[in-house]
Amino acid sequence: MGELPQSIRESIKNDIKNCEFLGFKDAAHLHQKEPFSVGIYRNQNKEMLVTCITEMPEVSPRMIDWWFGWHLNESERYQLWHPKAHISASLKEDNSHFETDKEKYLNMDSYVSEYIGNELNNLCISFVEPKQFGFSDLNDEKETAICAHVRDMSNNISVASITHLVSRNAEGSRMQSSFWLGMNPTHTNSILTSLIKPLLESRLAKNILITDDLARNLLIHCAEEMNHLVKFLPILFKDKTN
């Protein structure tokens, strides 16, 4: 997969920072208004924020939109992204009839199996409109925001919210990624949510479920897959869209 960037290696070694941070509904402010850096943060509620930056020379925001629409429904495509950690990917509905790249992933549920660290995870990644994360005025020519909520399929409980903001620069693009862990624990069954939410939101539960190792492994995983994507996406995009 190649060597991790220096900023990632340093963040993995550093202590996790105890501080308050904005939630996923304010992702636009976090990404666009404040200095954004690589790191792992824990707030007083024991929720965690993992942030990653990927420099993407020769990659455009449009390529990222295309990639997310293209890879969702075939495991072989998903495995290109992280050959060591990605196992399978599927959709329960066909997205091939949609015309635009964004339509092919927005409001879709992607079912994936992947390793984060040494643990195999079966997840449902539900892609949503960027407006849900506070991105109301994106310039489609210069930027795109991939936003999603993640559910653990072993218990049907939401475990994370994600955004990848991709912005044009002189070399290509820069991707800013954020993962919020434990901030919105819900079950697909609303009755069960009302019963278990107080437990899931307790500091004790979050201390057990949201570990330092999980956060560090997630940062490594994101850095590996995004830096690997940079290596082949420009050529793949040109080949498939020409």
Where are these regions (language model features)?
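Hydrophobic residues positioned within well-ordered beta-strands of beta-sheet architectures
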Residues: 50-52, 146, 162, 175-177
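Terminal "cap-and-tail" regions of soluble proteins that handle hydrophobic small molecules
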Residues: 1-44, 167-242
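A short, structured loop/turn motif at beta-sheet edges
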Residues: 58, 135-141, 165-174
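Coil-to-beta-strand transition motifs
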Residues: 45-49, 61, 156-159, 168-174
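Hydrophobic ligand-binding cavity/cleft-lining segments
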Residues: 7-102
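Glycine-rich portal/gate segments that line the openings of hydrophobic small-molecule binding cavities
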Residues: 86-157
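Hydrophobic/aromatic beta-strand elements that line small-molecule binding cavities or substrate pockets
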Residues: 54, 132-133, 161-168, 179-180
